């Protein structure tokens, strides 16, 4: 199955749909984003060039620029495992509603959840504006209230103050 995102005139993601692989095949039997886009335009009656309409293919298995395979576990659940074939990595991230498509980066960027967070240019994900200062002696977490890193506490005790187990 393939996934396509419908974008508005500002490249905001309006919806994401599933398209059968058979609708992506060209006359030689090769998958083609253009064929999938054409099918989306016909089925959804939203043509590229119409006001507020463009379709872009997105990869369900790509996150932070890394392509993952779904591997079934012995208990019947699935686990994402980094693929040895990273040529399948596509547009940095899966498209999420209210996220954006950045044509300069050819990447889908998820919605910004926290004020002040910045885009990581490698992963096209949002993150705190400064690096995590955690060390082996202290752990920090981002506070959206103070918009800064704060030392983590467990039951009112700063993590750095919690006794470490003896070797």
Roles of regions detected by a PLM:
Residues 1-167:
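Viral virion structural and adsorption modules
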């Amino acid at each position: 199955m393939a996934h396509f995102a419908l974008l508005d005139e500002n490249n905001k993601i309006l919806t994401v749909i599933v398209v059968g692989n058979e609708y992506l095949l060209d006359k030689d039997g090769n998958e083609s984003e253009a064929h999938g886009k054409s099918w989306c335009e016909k089925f959804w009656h939203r043509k590229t060039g119409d006001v507020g309409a463009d379709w872009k293919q997105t990869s369900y298995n790509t996150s932070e620029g890394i392509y993952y395979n779904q591997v079934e576990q012995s208990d019947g659940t699935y686990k994402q495992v980094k693929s040895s074939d990273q040529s399948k990595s596509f547009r940095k991230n899966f498209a999420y509603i209210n996220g954006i498509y950045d044509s300069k980066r050819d990447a889908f960027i998820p919605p910004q959840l926290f004020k002040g967070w910045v885009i990581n240019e490698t992963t096209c994900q949002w993150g705190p504006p400064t690096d995590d200062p955690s060390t082996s002696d202290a752990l920090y977490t981002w506070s959206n209230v103070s918009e800064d890193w704060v030392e983590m506490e467990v039951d009112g005790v700063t993590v750095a103050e919690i006794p470490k187990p003896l070797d």
